[in-house]
Amino acid sequence: GVQVSEMILGCWVMGGAQWGGADDNESIRAIHAAYDAGINTLDTAEAYNDGYSESIIGKAIQGHPNYYSILSKALNCYSKYDQLKAACENSLKRLGRDYLDVYFLHWPSHFYGGKKVPLEETMAAMSELKKEGKIRAIGLSNFSVEEFKIAMEVDRVDVYQPPFNILW
């Protein structure tokens, strides 16, 4: 299975668009300092400044990409089969890796005004990505229990991030 550190470094701020932004070099130093402190798991998403957070991580782990466990998330607007597969490839390119340790569906397709795509179609793409070795584990983030059950009918959901944030 996927090995993650007890603590995970959240990388939403890296990329500069939200939470006041962050300097790229400071972000890279933070990733290296976290690794030195025993934190080798990085949580990101293509939604974090249009993939720029993933690009910063890619720069930080260059030369040692497999020292880290990387968790990333697909935008809900890429819920169709081909869109999701392409989104994963784009994340891998930005990160400079051949695989993601965990790839999450960030939100159900219909959130934020998105067009509803059958979860079975989206999960079929996730299952194929796993079979291809592009992802090691399938994750859901911000999905209901009912949606979780539908997803599990297609393939095993390995990781679940419930919709909880102490700031909201």
Regions found by a protein language model. Name each.
Residues 12-14, 45-47, 73-77, 105-110, ...:
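Active-site beta-loop-alpha junctions enriched in small/polar residues
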Residues 33, 37, 56-64, 94, ...:
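Alpha-helical structural signal in soluble globular domains
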Residues 1-68:
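N-terminal binding-site loop/beta-alpha segment at the start of enzyme catalytic domains
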Residues 92-113:
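Active-site groove signature of glycoside hydrolases
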Residues 108-168:
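Beta/alpha (TIM)-barrel catalytic core signal, keyed to glycine-rich beta->alpha loops juxtaposed to Asp/Glu
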Residues 4-8, 40-41, 67-71, 99-104, ...:
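Structural preference for beta-strand elements that scaffold enzyme active sites
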Residues 21-34, 80-95, 142-150:
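Short, acidic/polar
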Residues 13-25, 72-82, 111-116:
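Active-site mouth loops of central-metabolism enzymes
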